[in-house]
């Protein structure tokens, strides 16, 4: 059996997230359907994570198994040919047989985009606010995140997860061409975690919460303490890293 990694991107606007579910079309479902058509046999793909409904991905990965050696260049071209225009396959590559798209990922990176101006061309990808935020305070809050590992407070209730421990290696706010961008990198993320963190930091940027309040929310390990979240449409999964050993020479 041969294992292959798929590198892809998608606009999440028309999908109920990544993972297959009974009530709605998902990205995983679309790719599996098209891949199964091309290979003329049912194929199951395993993603590196589960983005929520409306969340986009500049880079997502998934793996699948196939008995024969595939022409990955040809398969990539053919798959792009029948997938809808809001899903793009960058490449398909062979990997080691025990490589896993989800469990072997070293890190994942997300970005959230905020604007203060009307933008008719990017309304679906930017969260618009009326007044500029205090990025100095928000970056102060960002620096605090790496001091903690239990992010229960930012996890959606009733999430099916064994642990709420995440190791955040980067969190910062930057402004590029008038757009505020929050970048966060960690070994893993909880459901709704990034959107909850951003929503709470916006409250800090509006002087509705203090840095002390932010610490209290984290240390409470209680989702009830959380007051704010942000819409999914401005959130992007932008990178996933893997150890070199999973790739074939």
Curated annotation (Swiss-Prot):
Cite the NCBIfam families for this sequence.
hisT_truA (TIGR00071)
Q: What is the main EC category here?
A: isomerase
The entry's family comment says: Belongs to the tRNA pseudouridine synthase TruA family.
* Source taxonomy: Bacteria, Pseudomonadati, Bacteroidota, Bacteroidia, Bacteroidales
The UniProt annotation places substrate binding at 110
Instruction: Tell me which Pfam families the record gives.
Output: PseudoU_synth_1
Catalytic reactions on record:
uridine(38/39/40) in tRNA = pseudouridine(38/39/40) in tRNA
This protein's UniProt keywords: Isomerase, tRNA processing
Could you name the domain of life of the organism this protein comes from?
Bacteria
**Single GO BP term:** tRNA pseudouridine synthesis
Q: What is this protein called?
A: tRNA pseudouridine synthase A
Q: Where are the transmembrane segments?
A: none
Role played: Formation of pseudouridine at positions 38, 39 and 40 in the anticodon stem and loop of transfer RNAs.
Complex formation: Homodimer.
Please give one Gene Ontology molecular function term for this protein: tRNA pseudouridine(38-40) synthase activity
Query: tRNA processing as a keyword?
Result: yes
């Amino acid at each position: 059996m041969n294992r292959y990694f798929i590198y892809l991107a998608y606009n999440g606007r028309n999908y109920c997230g990544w993972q297959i579910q009974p009530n709605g079309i998902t990205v995983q479902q679309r790719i599996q359907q098209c891949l199964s058509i091309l290979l003329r046999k049912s194929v199951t793909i395993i993603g590196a994570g589960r983005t929520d409904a409306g969340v986009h991905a500049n880079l997502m990965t998934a793996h699948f198994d196939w008995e024969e050696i595939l022409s990955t260049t040809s398969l990539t071209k053919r798959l792009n040919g029948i997938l809808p225009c809001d899903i793009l396959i960058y490449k398909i590559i062979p990997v080691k047989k025990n490589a896993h798209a989800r469990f072997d990922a070293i890190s994942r990176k997300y970005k959230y985009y905020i604007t203060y101006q009307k933008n008719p061309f990017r309304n679906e990808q930017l969260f618009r606010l009326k007044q500029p935020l205090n990025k100095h305070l928000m970056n102060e809050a960002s620096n605090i995140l790496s001091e903690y590992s239990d992010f229960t407070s930012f996890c959606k209730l009733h999430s099916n997860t064994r642990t709420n421990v995440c190791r955040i290696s980067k969190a910062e706010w930057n402004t590029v061409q008038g757009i505020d961008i929050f970048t966060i990198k960690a070994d893993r993320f909880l459901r709704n975690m990034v959107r909850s963190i951003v929503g709470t930091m916006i409250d800090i940027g509006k002087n509705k919460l203090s840095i002390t309040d932010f610490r209290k929310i984290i240390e409470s390990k209680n989702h009830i303490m959380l007051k704010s979240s942000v819409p999914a449409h401005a959130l992007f999964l932008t990178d996933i890293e893997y150890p070199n050993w999973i790739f074939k020479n």
